[in-house]
Structures are given as C-alpha cells and as structure tokens.
Amino acid sequence: MAKQKKHPTGTIAQNKKARHDYFIEHRFEAGMVLAGWEVKSLRAGKAQLVDSYVLLKDGEAWLLGSHFTPLTTASTHVIADPTRSRKLLLNQRELEKLFAAVQQKGYACVCLSLYWSKHLVKCEIALGKGKKEYDKRHTERERDSDRELQRAVRTKGKED
C-alpha cells in the first residue's frame, strides 16, 4: 500500500495590516483558482498579502495585490506572474451580500489570510469598515493596557 502524503496544515499567510486598518464585521471563506506553480509556492509558504484586496466585478470576486513568489524549481515553460489577479470561488448569495455591502460608503472587502483546508487552499476574506487614525491609536492603547494587566497577573502569581 502506498504511503500517505502529509498535507500541510495551518495558515499559509496572514494580512495583519488589514486587521489594523479595518473594523472586521463579517468573514467569508472562499476557494481560489490557482495554477500548479502557485500551489507549490504556497506549500513552501512563499505568499504575501500585505496590500491585497478583493475586487467585485461582473458578479465575480477577484483577489488583487497578493504576491506569490515562484519557486526556482518550478517549470521553465510556464511564465509565472507573481502578482496576477486570482479568482475567488464564493456562493451567489455570498457574492450578493458582499456586493451590497461594498456599495455602502466606508466598507471594503479585504483578504485576511490564506490557509489549508484538507488539500485545498482557502482564502479568508472579510467585510471591513475603515478605521480613522484616532481609532487605531485607541486600539493600540487598549492592547497595551491588556498586556500590562496580563503581565501584572503573571508576576503576582509568581510572588506567592
């Protein structure tokens, strides 16, 4: 009997900047249409989502701005475009909900992370409302105070 291959598990890439710049309201799981060399580079963890966003046009969702670095061992007869737009696979109901929300002022659709679901690559996209500068500072202050509180609780437990 053939030996079973282990599929990579967990997160491939995260977009931490999106979590910093937006109030995340709704999350969706979308499949992706990928070429063979892209799957190989994702298995190696060579993906960046820093300035990526989701464009909704003609009833379809497209991931733009993501960068998948091609491997040097990839095929030579295929021209690899690392920043090409990639189609996202969503249900019609989800697409309509996204399209209606993005039409409202202040809402954007961004990619939060790429991860493996069994042997498939999934993209977690979210509807977000843009944060103002003072919102970002407020969030940072809350995070710092929580960190201080956790540190105080930890040191108090060690003193006993």
Swiss-Prot record:
Q: Which InterPro entries match?
A: SmpB, SsrA-bd_prot, SsrA-bd_prot_CS
Please provide the record's keywords in A-Z order.
Cytoplasm, RNA-binding
Q: Which GO terms describe its cellular component?
A: cytosol
**Pfam families from the entry?**
SmpB
Keyword Disulfide bond listed: no
Disulphide bridges: none
Where in or outside the cell it occurs: the entry states:
Cytoplasm
Region listing for Disordered, in residue ranges: 131-160
- Tell whether Metal-binding is among the UniProt keywords: no
- A GO BP entry: trans-translation
Q: Which GO terms describe its molecular function?
A: RNA binding
User: Function of this protein?
Assistant: Required for rescue of stalled ribosomes mediated by trans-translation. Binds to transfer-messenger RNA (tmRNA), required for stable association of tmRNA with ribosomes. tmRNA and SmpB together mimic tRNA shape, replacing the anticodon stem-loop with SmpB. tmRNA is encoded by the ssrA gene; the 2 termini fold to resemble tRNA(Ala) and it encodes a 'tag peptide', a short internal open reading frame. During trans-translation Ala-aminoacylated tmRNA acts like a tRNA, entering the A-site of stalled ribosomes, displacing the stalled mRNA.
**Family of this protein:** Belongs to the SmpB family.
> What protein am I looking at?
SsrA-binding protein
Species of origin reads Pseudomonas fluorescens (strain ATCC BAA-477 / NRRL B-23932 / Pf-5)
Q: Which gene encodes it?
A: smpB
